[in-house]
Amino acid sequence: MIIRNWTLLLFIISLISISSALIAEYFFNLQPCELCLKQRHPYYLILVSLVFIFIIKNLNKVVFYLLIQLAAVYGLFYSIWHVGVENKILKGPSGCSVMLKNSESASDLKAQILSKQVISCDEVIWSFFGISAASINTLVLLVIFILNAIYLFKNYGTKKEKNV
């Protein structure tokens, strides 16, 4: 049942995921870090791919499902990295901390600090029952990766023999 309606389910999962992130940012003022922003990219690519799949008939859809698979791998890379950074296991990218230039005065230093709004990647800004958003995203992308692989294999993995 899940695999039969996979395209619609994937669209709903992706739409909820990206909508949740945007609502958290713009309505609840939970500013994303650099890794959070990179974890949104797969959902945008998945949604665009699904629009092509839904709209264009006689399209080689396997290419788009493979693109979705690559998007899931990309997202898993960044979400696993983010979970590692949050748990102080891995080091975050340089954009996740404030880089200040040498200043000649305290007022210049203060101006630099106040002009930069940098959200640290190692701080959990939101969690659900103790599970960070990056961890939830890892699980969602893992489900997408596994179910999309099953869908690809069932629909495109083996040649179906026709009765002659």
Regions found by a protein language model. Name each.
Residues S20-E25, Y74-I89, S107:
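C-terminal TM-helix exit segments that contain a strictly Trp-centered aromatic cap at the helix terminus
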Residues I13, S17-S20, I46-S49, A71-W81, ...:
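Membrane-embedded alpha-helical transmembrane segments of multi-pass integral membrane proteins
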Residues L37-F52, N102-E104:
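Iron-sulfur (Fe-S) cluster-binding segments and ferredoxin-like electron-carrier domains
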Residues N87-S132:
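Extracytosolic (periplasmic/ER-lumenal) interhelical loops and adjacent juxtamembrane/interface segments
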